[in-house]
């Protein structure tokens, strides 16, 4: 066993003394059992994580029952909804790297035989997944699960995105103070990740198709008995996988990455999943070309439109058959998935999901009646995005195929929000928000406030927004993010000027400004060099090492230092 490194031999008597002091070893034979880390992310201020201590206790009990010894440790967590709109959002994406590094540190320092990961919200799941692939120790994931959808006094289904859009509507005077406060009190009624197809739930659904989580991981409610039983079954499965030496890199292959994007397309997942999945591919040593995403989109139908793109919540998806029903439907179309891949169940993706039929055709559409014949995400290329940009086409009004408008430029999120709120932004504008990428932000903050204000003011079809920053999974509208290279790295988004005509072509998947190559070159020579906004602390170190979104926003040590 891997853990023999710290518990076998006379020279490890001091280590054994310390292990006895933990109280985790109940019997003399326990030293001969596998040591299993529980990588938890319990934190009081994040509603998606307040219940994870209880879930970890269930996992501990089941791991012991299965014949192994559990040791729990914790990671940090950031709630993107609470961190939104201020310096806290600068720390959200960078927290992914801290989580990955912290988990790697504990796992490798103590030679665990397996790891039970309990994530839930936005950056925690991908951070833990980066650690799982990096350490390549037998692992399984079981998230905390989504919260129930809220309900307004008028009986309208609510999610957190409803609340963000209500801010814009309230500023416009289109909803009353009473209705506004009612929504605030009822949008998030239970613990769990936010109820729509936002980043947390997108990633937790993708864990199923990647093969590192059990079926229904992405949709079973946080407060359900099914979630607690899933924790138990995942613990039993992990101990079996330790015995059989099934490791993350046996499961995370290029085919698995392709299938993750296919499910993302079918469910209209968050654009952040592109960022995280590219980072995971990089960690697994897979050189993944962004162009593959468009190829996958072309052959993957859009089957389930979930909040914020509809009123359906994750619980509605669960009741309609969950991710297994969507996977089963996609498997009926040859070439869409790679169903004979290994998963943590010890079975193939096909064996896990075959025969799991759709129970509600309003929530999950069948192959013969998709929302769209192509997937809900697109990667755009052009003279504004030589290395790509991402748009959630599933969140764009279906009538919009091409949008051309005049640029109105802002060098920060806050400047843009102020201009939208004071009506400087008008119909026909393309709002350009730059210097908000991984390096420029720093931290690639989410642009949920400006997009929500645009939609809340009723301009969702009349104003577009492009940025080298990113979006919340709750974003909808004509919103193009992840533009690469970012402005801070000399990308052409930094060369746009007010009044330039910008065209977003969803049919041809292009993003262009109507300026010649010569003019853009002239502007680049006049550009002031980027200077880091933060000079001290973690964000300063992050700025010096992070790359643009087309790589997944990973941190790379310069080649001359390796």
From Swiss-Prot:
Annotated keywords: 2Fe-2S, Amino-acid biosynthesis, Branched-chain amino acid biosynthesis, Iron, Iron-sulfur, Lyase, Magnesium, Metal-binding
Source organism: Staphylococcus epidermidis (strain ATCC 35984 / DSM 28319 / BCRC 17069 / CCUG 31568 / BM 3577 / RP62A)
Catalytic residue list: 472 (proton acceptor)
Upper lineage: Bacteria, Bacillati, Bacillota, Bacilli, Bacillales
UniProt cofactor note: Binds 1 [2Fe-2S] cluster per subunit. This cluster acts as a Lewis acid cofactor.
Reactions mediated catalytically: (2R)-2,3-dihydroxy-3-methylbutanoate = 3-methyl-2-oxobutanoate + H2O; (2R,3R)-2,3-dihydroxy-3-methylpentanoate = (S)-3-methyl-2-oxopentanoate + H2O
Gene Ontology cellular-component annotations: cytosol
Binding, [2Fe-2S] cluster: 121, 194
InterPro entries (alphabetical): Dihydro-acid_dehy_C, DihydroxyA_deHydtase, DiOHA_6PGluconate_deHydtase_CS, ILV_EDD_C, ILV_EDD_N, IlvD/EDD_N
Protein role: Functions in the biosynthesis of branched-chain amino acids. Catalyzes the dehydration of (2R,3R)-2,3-dihydroxy-3-methylpentanoate (2,3-dihydroxy-3-methylvalerate) into 2-oxo-3-methylpentanoate (2-oxo-3-methylvalerate) and of (2R)-2,3-dihydroxy-3-methylbutanoate (2,3-dihydroxyisovalerate) into 2-oxo-3-methylbutanoate (2-oxoisovalerate), the penultimate precursor to L-isoleucine and L-valine, respectively.
PROSITE patterns: ILVD_EDD_1, ILVD_EDD_2
Record: residues binding Mg(2+): 80, 122-123, 446
Keyword Protein biosynthesis: no
Family: Belongs to the IlvD/Edd family.
Protein name: Dihydroxy-acid dehydratase
PANTHER family: D-XYLONATE DEHYDRATASE, D-XYLONATE DEHYDRATASE YAGF-RELATED
Modified residues (N6-carboxylysine): 123
Molecular-function GO term, any one: dihydroxy-acid dehydratase activity
One Pfam family, short name: ILV_EDD_C
Cofactor needs: [2Fe-2S] cluster; Mg(2+)
BP-aspect Gene Ontology terms: isoleucine biosynthetic process; L-valine biosynthetic process
Assembly mode: Homodimer.
E.C. number: 4.2.1.9
Keyword Magnesium: yes
């Amino acid at each position: 066993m891997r853990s023999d490194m710290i518990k076998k031999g006379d020279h490890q008597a001091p280590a054994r003394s310390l292990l006895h002091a933990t109280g985790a070893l109940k019997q003399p034979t326990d030293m001969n059992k596998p040591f299993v880390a529980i990588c938890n992310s319990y934190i009081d201020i994040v509603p998606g994580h307040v219940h994870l201590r209880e879930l970890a206790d269930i996992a501990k009990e089941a791991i012991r029952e299965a014949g192994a010894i559990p040791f729990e440790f914790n990671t940090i967590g950031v709630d993107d909804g609470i961190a939104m709109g201020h310096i806290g959002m600068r720390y959200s994406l960078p927290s992914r790297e801290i989580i990955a590094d912290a988990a790697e540190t504990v796992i490798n320092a103590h030679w665990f035989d397996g790891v039970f990961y309990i994530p839930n919200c936005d950056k925690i799941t991908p951070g833990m997944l980066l650690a799982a692939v990096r350490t390549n120790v037998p692992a399984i994931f079981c998230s905390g699960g989504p919260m129930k959808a809220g309900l307004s006094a008028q009986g309208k289904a609510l999610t957190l995105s409803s609340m963000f859009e209500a801010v814009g509507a309230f500023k416009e005077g289109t909803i009353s103070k009473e209705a506004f406060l009612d929504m605030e009190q009822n949008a998030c009624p239970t613990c769990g990740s936010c109820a729509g197809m936002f980043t947390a739930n997108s990633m937790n659904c993708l864990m199923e198709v990647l093969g590192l989580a059990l079926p229904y991981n992405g949709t079973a409610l946080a407060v359900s008995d099914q979630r607690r039983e899933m924790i138990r079954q995942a613990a039993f499965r992990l101990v079996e996988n330790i015995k059989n030496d099934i490791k993350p890199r046996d499961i995370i292959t290029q085919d698995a990455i392709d299938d993750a994007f296919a499910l993302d397309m079918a469910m209209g997942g968050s654009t952040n999943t592109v960022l995280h999945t590219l980072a995971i591919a990089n960690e697994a040593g897979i050189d993944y070309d962004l162009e593959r995403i468009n190829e996958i989109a072309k052959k993957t139908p859009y089957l389930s439109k979930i909040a914020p793109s509809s009123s359906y919540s994750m619980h509605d998806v669960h009741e309609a058959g969950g991710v297994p029903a969507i996977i089963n439907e996609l498997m009926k179309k040859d070439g869409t998935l790679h169903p004979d891949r290994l998963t943590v169940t010890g079975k193939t993706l096909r064996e896990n999901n075959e025969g799991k039929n759709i129970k509600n055709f309003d929530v999950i559409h069948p192959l013969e009646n998709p929302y769209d014949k192509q997937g809900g995400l697109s990667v755009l290329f052009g003279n504004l995005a030589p290395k790509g940009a991402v748009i959630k086409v599933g969140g764009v009004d279906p009538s919009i195929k091409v949008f051309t408008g005049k640029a109105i430029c802002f060098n920060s999120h806050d400047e843009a929000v102020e201009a939208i709120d004071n009506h400087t932004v008008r119909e026909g504008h393309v709002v350009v928000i730059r210097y908000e990428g991984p390096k420029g932000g720093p931290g690639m903050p989410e642009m949920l406030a400006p997009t929500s204000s645009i939609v809340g003011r009723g301009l969702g079809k009349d104003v577009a927004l492009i940025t080298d920053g990113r979006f919340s999974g709750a974003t909808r509208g004509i919103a193009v993010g992840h533009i690469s290279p970012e402005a801070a790295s000399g990308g052409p988004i930094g060369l746009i000027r007010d009044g330039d005509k910008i065209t977003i072509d969803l049919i041809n998947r292009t993003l262009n400004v109507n300026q010649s190559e010569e003019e853009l070159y002239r502007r680049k020579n006049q550009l002031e060099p980027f200077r880091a906004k933060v000079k001290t602390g973690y964000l300063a170190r992050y700025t010096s090492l992070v790359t643009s979104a087309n790589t997944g926003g990973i941190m790379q040590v310069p080649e001359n230092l390796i």
